[in-house]
Amino acid sequence: MHNKLNEIKKNESPPKVIKNLFSKDEINKFLSLYEQLPTTIHNKKQNVIKKRWLKEYGKELEELFYNRLKNEIGEFKYDNLKTESGDIIFGLFQESYNPIGLHIDGGFNFEDLIYKQSLIPLTPVGSTVIFKNRFYGKSTNFTIDKNELEKTKLNYGQNIRSNKHIGMFGNKPFNKEDHQKFLMHEKINDLLGLEIELVYEWELG
């Protein structure tokens, strides 16, 4: 668990959807930045492309992003990953045509003070499911798949695999209607004890 768990809990708040944070022109600039960035991962099997926001690209956009977010959540510091040469990464762009599995973005260092997570959709197609339940470990992909759980030799910046969420939040079966509507890509038994807090249907801006 994180060393600053009490401080993390004090900073917790319900999910908040901020509309019109960025203009249409600014969104187009982010899309242009995405096209310029080199591809980090292209998983053709899962149809996912990931690109790191390297510091050599879009410095003005980074300042814009930081200041807009600071106006909403107050002063903060990025939980930056680094490149192979030790340079910081501003963030991660992800282009996916399939749903992303159950996970948390809890950072990779228990010394860090996790504050807020931000998600900026660059397309109006898609949604994000946020749960009421809280898990205070490092960045983790949750699964009951034995093959996934055996993956322990992970690269820098990859989420660990875990099934520790099973039973952690009780044994109440997951809502079948919610499963069919939002989470058919997950095995319902993998959602044991979980409860949805918000389903955010993406909007530009």
Language model region names:
Residues 94-204:
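Catalytic core of non-heme Fe(II) oxygenases with the double-stranded beta-helix
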Residues 1-89, 97-99, 143-171:
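Non-heme Fe(II)/2-oxoglutarate
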